[in-house]
Amino acid sequence: MANKLYEMQKLTADVSRDVAASPEEWMKFLDTAARLYRYTFPEQLLIYAKRPEATAVASMEIWNKRMYRWINRGSRGIALIDNTSGPRMKLRYVFDIQDTHKVKNLGRDPKLWEMIPAGEQLSAEYLQNQFSLEEVDGGLAETLRQAARESVQEW
């Protein structure tokens, strides 16, 4: 397990450098991260590295108990670093909705997030305030790039 944990830490660092170095790679990452806004930046990086096409991910417990969806046989989870359990880090696994199926008539589909155009300016202003960024041309996309650079440098 320690070896796998080290692999995931290294993968997180490698992917963070890759997405920060290339605008094209950054935009691909954002396509994934936009669907996974409840996950931390390092978790989004790992999900992007393993399943860039993921649309909605959750633990097996959430899929089973809240969404009434079962994990398909043979599906492989996406390993994320869990540092919430005290000083020892461990791995936890999440599964994409494509790895699940509904339980008879009970299963639910998750509500996927979407941004309305009016929210773009508010989001850009919020990020500028949170990261002490200068206002730039390019709207929300450029503000997100700046915020990402700041996050990667801090991380």
Where in this protein do the model-derived segments appear?
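N-terminal accessory/interface modules of nucleic-acid-binding and processing proteins
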Residues: 1-155
